Amino acid sequence: GPGPHIIMDHLMEHSNVDFQWGNHDVVWMGAAAGSPLCILTVLKTTLAYNNVDTLERGYGIPLRCLEHYAEEYYAQSDLTRWMPHADPNATDVRPANLARVARMHKAVTVLMLKLEAEVIARNPDFEMQGRDYLRQIDYDAGTVRCGGKVYPLLDCDFPTVDPTAPERLLPREEDIIARLVRDFKGSEKLQKHVEFLFSQGSVYSCVNGNLLYHGAVPMDEDGQFTACLLYTSPSPRDYAAS
């Protein structure tokens, strides 16, 4: 939603605050730490909801280089499916501004898919090969394979994607990502907010015999917990309620 930086300012004034991190919290922490893929994920969500002010004014993160890049490659694109979910009470819902945001939204999504392809290829144990969408596309037929089925693409305009190596970044794209990493890591206010979020939060906590968590716990069809591969060892507090 709009103004998360304002909410964080208010929360930091309280003496007793704790968080159970959700997926968006973790992505923002990753972005502040300089993860390119987390940064692009944050940007995609921000642009999809026309919440650019949070980045540009709230955290002082300029998007000019991204805007120029999107204008160059997607100025003639059909942006119908990339238009942001505009709040009618937002400060700028002019068609020209919405088109600007839509171009950046598409540009960021393609960049994000390129980086996702690299991560999936480097980590076969994630078993996410089916989510490597750029490699699931038949660029000649204009279709994509998803969940074992083939669907027609609603947008086939990929001027920056090489079908033979879809994850490959253009030199300009590498430069844009490097600038975004620098600006996210260099935002003093963002770093302050994320440090507070990190120091006062956890993925879950056990309080009075209750497990507090955000999101969902994996279960099977019979309502039993499913086994999960963890990339860290359990801590003593995992057994606090047992």
Where are these regions (language model features)?
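Feature recognizes metal-dependent phosphohydrolase scaffolds
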Residues: G1-D238, S242
